[in-house]
């Protein structure tokens, strides 16, 4: 999801990208491209990020919460798990990470990291920051979604992902928190159900009008330029 890419404005990603990998040429190409953006690019981690890499980086305070910057592209900013920010006038709470259902086919430390699942400390920290703000926030950004909503969105398509402890944790966040919109990724589909105020993103970009008191969002095709796609 994104705002206008001007001055202090920001592009946001729900944890689908993992540039810190051991493929030097592709990594360098991506970094050189990201550095050209005249704005901050902020993201939450997913389940395929190199979590060991990010764990070694220093943190700093940014817009009310802790972040990490990519050393080779300082405009690329990692929003950390359980942190609470004010961005473009909106309050934002974040929780990256999720369980990989294909981890048995991956190699630990190369294509899979056990830290993909938020730790108990990170989960408690997330609840503490929400409690400090009265369980009230404009936007929630997570990689995966609450487990209790999966069947409403996908039927029986993602039963393996229902065992993810991250989704169980997010059930409690969903129950306790007053929020205006929740965005997540992980499912590799684009689907929005206004009844639940949660939108799953994959190819779509969402532009939030921060000046609109109704907090309306508009969808655009992100990569493929397809026309006439169902909402």
What is each of the regions a protein language model found here?
Residues 40-44, 55, 59-74, 145-219:
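Conserved beta-sheet core of the metallophosphoesterase superfamily
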Residues 77-79, 93, 201:
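General small-molecule cofactor/ligand-binding pocket signal
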Residues 224-231:
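Long, low-complexity, intrinsically disordered segments
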Residues 5-11, 65, 88-164:
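Active-site-proximal loop/helix segment associated with metal-binding centers of metalloenzymes
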Residues 1-86, 159, 166-167, 175-176:
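Core catalytic region of metal-dependent phosphoesterases/phosphodiesterases
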């Amino acid at each position: 999801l994104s705002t206008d890419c001007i001055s202090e404005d920001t592009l946001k990603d729900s944890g689908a990208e993992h540039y810190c990998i051991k493929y030097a040429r592709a990594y360098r190409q991506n970094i050189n491209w990201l550095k050209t953006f005249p704005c901050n690019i902020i993201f939450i981690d997913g389940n395929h990020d190199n979590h060991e890499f990010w764990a070694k980086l220093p943190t700093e305070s940014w817009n009310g919460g802790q972040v990490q910057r990519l050393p080779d592209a300082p405009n690329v900013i990692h929003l950390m798990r359980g942190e609470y920010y004010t961005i473009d006038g909106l309050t934002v709470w974040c929780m990256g990470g999720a369980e990989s259902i294909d981890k048995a086919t991956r190699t630990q430390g190369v294509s899979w990291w056990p830290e993909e699942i938020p730790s108990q400390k990170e989960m408690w920290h997330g609840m503490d920051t929400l409690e400090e703000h009265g369980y009230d926030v404009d936007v929630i950004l997570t990689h995966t979604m609450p487990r209790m909503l999966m069947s409403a969105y996908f039927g029986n398509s993602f039963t393996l992902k229902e065992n993810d402890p991250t989704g169980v944790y997010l059930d409690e966040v969903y129950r306790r928190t007053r929020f205006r919109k929740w965005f997540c990724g992980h499912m590799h589909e684009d689907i929005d159900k206004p009844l639940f105020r949660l939108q799953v993103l994959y190819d779509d970009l969402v532009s939030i009008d921060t000046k609109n008191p109704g907090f309306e969002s508009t969808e655009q095709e992100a990569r493929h330029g397809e026309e006439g796609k169902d909402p």
